[in-house]
């Protein structure tokens, strides 16, 4: 029983709790609704207040407009009699306007008739007046007055034109007298002389800069060649070391296998150790077979000779390039004699070079001498190239009148007639330099590379008998003409001038240089017979003759030479095709 009661009580409690929760939730919802309704009511009250305010404002406006309408009605009632009065006055004014308009029209017609009558009377009076003599005189004077006025206007226009012309003529002329004109021209000539001197200085400085640039280029090329040679020698030395190692290994193997066949191997190695020369020189060289009883000594000598032959090949090719540059410059400078001497000397040197030594005991000495000669020979080639470039520039400035096509044709023909020859490898020569004459050493010509061969100390070669080098023979055919324009000149290009004649001409030109006045006179086209600075004017300045729009006034200028500028008798030896001066025209 108790259990059932507890269960029922529990159920009741649960139901009450559930209902209580439901009531709480409903109460909260109702509270929320009430709050919302209160807010809505407040908003509606606010809107109602606004509406009441607008209603009150509209009521006030309605009252104001009602009062204003009543005032307007009162005014209308008051203004009605005045309006009636104004209407009556308007009607009266219209009636008066119609009356006045009719009267004005009648007056117009009457006055128009009067005007017509007066015009007819005036015409009658004019006819009567024109018949009188006074009227005729009046009209004649009137016509004369009009003509005089027209003439006066034309004269005033002419006077204005003349005044403008006169004002133009009143401007002062730039040269009021002939003396001032001549002085101005003299000043202009002096200014042109100064400009020409400045231009000559600039040309000299530019030529010097060009020479320096050429020298720097030559030095750069020479350094590049040395670098390439150094690299090639390194590569060759490496290859030779590798080959030597390979040959030593092969020799050891062959000695082990074939102990008795060393004689055959030495023969094959001597055939492979020939000098490596160009194709033309190989035709003249015959292979020399070396027989020795000692195989080791022969192998060492053959290896050293092979090294020398390869180094000779490298230096030989580089010297060929240098000789080609030198020969090209010689052809451009029109020097056949220099070509002939270089060709003959180089052929003689080649004949000596092609003789191979039968003894190879001095191979180490030759290699040491070769290194010294290579350095000295390279310096000589650089000097030769500089020398050839200077001479080519000088002769180009001397013969600038000739066309470029003729020069190119002559260069090609001379290059075909005189073939280029190759030179010997530098290391085969001796460090003894070829000596030039004493007179040429004073002028400080660049030394030429050595062309002597001294393989056998006891034997004297034939080449040492020639004391003059081809580079000096090339320069011997030129003499200095003037320091300003030309550096070298020759009377006949096919003949050579000796060293004594060269010194005589050189001293004569140094003792008697051209003066500044002579150069100025030559620049201003002075005849040889005139002296001094003269002006020639006509006696009567008023009598001028004009022809073809130009004045016949003569104005010659002549600049004289100084007493010290007379050319010496020693200069008569120079027989050149062109004169010593160059003419410039400025005007």
From Swiss-Prot:
Its main location: nucleus. Keywords: Chromosome, Developmental protein, Differentiation, Disease variant, DNA recombination, Meiosis, Phosphoprotein, Premature ovarian failure, Spermatogenesis. GO terms for biological process: homologous chromosome pairing at meiosis; meiotic DNA double-strand break processing involved in reciprocal meiotic recombination; oogenesis; regulation of DNA-binding transcription factor activity; spermatogenesis; synaptonemal complex assembly. Residues 356-378, 568-587 are annotated as: Disordered. Residues 357-367 have a biased composition (Polar residues). GO terms for cellular component: central element; chromosome. Highest expression in retina, skeletal muscle, testis and colon. The modification Phosphoserine is found at residue 439. The keyword Phosphoprotein applies. It is found in: Chromosome. Residues 368-378 have a biased composition (Basic and acidic residues). Pfam families: S6OS1. The keyword Cell membrane does not apply. PANTHER family: PROTEIN SIX6OS1. Meiotic protein that localizes to the central element of the synaptonemal complex and is required for chromosome synapsis during meiotic recombination. Required for the appropriate processing of intermediate recombination nodules before crossover formation. Interacts with SYCE1. Interacts with proteasome subunit PSMA8; to participate in meiosis progression during spermatogenesis. It is linked to Spermatogenic failure 52: An autosomal recessive infertility disorder characterized by azoospermia due to meiotic arrest at the spermatocyte stage. This is Protein SIX6OS1. It comes from Homo sapiens.
């Amino acid at each position: 029983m108790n259990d059932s009661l507890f269960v029922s009580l529990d159920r009741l409690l649960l139901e009450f709790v559930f209902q209580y929760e439901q009531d709480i939730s409903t109460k909260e919802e109702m509270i929320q609704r009430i709050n919302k309704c209160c807010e809505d009511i407040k908003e509606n009250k606010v809107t109602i207040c606004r509406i009441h305010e607008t209603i009150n404002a509209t009521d006030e406006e309605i009252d104001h407009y009602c009062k204003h309408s009543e005032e307007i009605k009162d005014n209308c009632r008051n203004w009605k009699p005045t309006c009636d009065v104004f209407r009556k006055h308007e009607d009266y004014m219209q009636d008066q306007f119609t009356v006045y308009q009719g009267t004005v029209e009648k007056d117009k017609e009457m006055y128009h008739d009067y005007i017509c009558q007066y015009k007819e009377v005036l015409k009658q009076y004019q006819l009567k007046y024109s018949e009188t003599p006074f009227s005729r005189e009046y009209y004649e004077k009137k016509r004369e007055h009009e003509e005089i006025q027209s003439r006066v206007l034309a004269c005033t226009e002419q006077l204005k034109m003349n005044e403008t012309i006169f004002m133009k003529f009143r401007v002062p002329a730039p040269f009021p007298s002939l003396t001032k004109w001549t002085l101005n021209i003299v000043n202009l000539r002096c200014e042109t002389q100064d400009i020409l001197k400045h231009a000559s200085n600039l040309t000299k400085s530019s030529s010097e800069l060009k020479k320096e640039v050429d020298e720097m280029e030559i030095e750069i090329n020479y350094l590049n060649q040395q670098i390439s040679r150094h690299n090639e020698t390194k590569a060759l030395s490496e290859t030779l070391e590798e080959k030597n190692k390979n040959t030593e290994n092969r020799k050891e193997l062959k000695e082990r296998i074939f102990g008795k066949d060393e004689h055959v191997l030495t023969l094959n190695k001597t055939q492979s150790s020939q000098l490596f020369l160009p194709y033309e020189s190989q035709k003249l060289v015959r292979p020399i077979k070396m027989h020795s009883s000692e195989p080791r000594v022969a192998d060492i000598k053959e290896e050293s000779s092979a090294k020398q032959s390869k180094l000779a090949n490298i230096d030989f090719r580089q010297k060929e390039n240098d000789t080609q540059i030198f020969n090209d410059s010689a052809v451009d400078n029109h020097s056949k004699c220099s070509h002939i001497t270089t060709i003959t000397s180089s052929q003689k040197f080649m004949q000596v070079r092609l003789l191979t030594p039968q003894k190879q005991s001095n191979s180490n000495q030759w290699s040491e001498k070769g290194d010294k000669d290579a350095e000295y020979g390279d310096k000589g080639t650089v000097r030769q190239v500089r020398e050839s470039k200077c001479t080519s520039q000088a002769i180009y400035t001397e013969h600038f009148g000739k066309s470029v096509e003729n020069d190119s044709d002559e260069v090609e023909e001379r290059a075909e007639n005189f073939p280029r020859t190759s030179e010997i490898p530098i290391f085969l020569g001796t460090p003894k330099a070829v000596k030039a004459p004493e007179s040429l050493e004073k002028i400080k010509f660049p030394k030429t590379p050595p062309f002597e061969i001294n393989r056998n100390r006891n034997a004297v070669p034939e080449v040492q008998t020639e004391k003059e080098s081809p580079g000096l023979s090339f320069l011997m055919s030129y003499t200095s003409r003037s320091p300003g324009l030309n550096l070298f000149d020759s009377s006949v290009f096919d003949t050579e001038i000796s060293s004594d004649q060269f010194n005589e001409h050189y001293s004569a030109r140094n003792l008697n240089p051209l003066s500044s006045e002579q150069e100025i006179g030559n620049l201003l086209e002075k005849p040889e017979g005139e002296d001094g600075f003269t002006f020639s004017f006509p006696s009567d300045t008023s009598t001028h003759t004009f022809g073809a729009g130009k004045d016949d006034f003569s104005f010659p200028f002549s600049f004289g030479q100084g007493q010290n500028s007379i050319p010496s008798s020693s200069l008569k030896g120079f027989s050149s095709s062109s004169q010593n001066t160059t003419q410039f025209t400025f005007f």
